[in-house]
Amino acid sequence: MKENPAPAAVGAAWQVVSVETTARTQIKDITREIAALVKQSGVESGVVHLYVPHTTAGILINESDDPDVARDIGDALDRLVPRGAAYKHYEGNADSHIKASLVGVSAVAPIEGGKLGLGRWQGIFFCEFDGPRQRQVKVRISRD
């Protein structure tokens, strides 16, 4: 019986994409940066793992064709979790922690034919909730 080899990771470590935000709440499209890493990897079929190592930021995959969608997401989160409400955390950014918890800090996308296998209208967004700041997204590309 032939054994299937374990999936090989591309590179020994996570790669880092730097993200500079310019507003306290900002939903920033980083699809191009991630797509460039996928292309550089040479992986034809696999998975890209994305992780945000911050407690007041997150990552999501959603519509990227209309920039109003990203603005609507940020505005909706600001309405759902307003800044300055009576939170127990007293550093002034409790709302940012809650928003990051709702959005999440990780995402996974397929690699198909050497490219990101996102849906037609999908993009990858870094979600800043306590900016402006210099942030990171950790990226790991694995082949099937």
Protein language model features and the residues they cover:
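Active-site histidine-anchored catalytic micro-motif
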Residues: 1-144
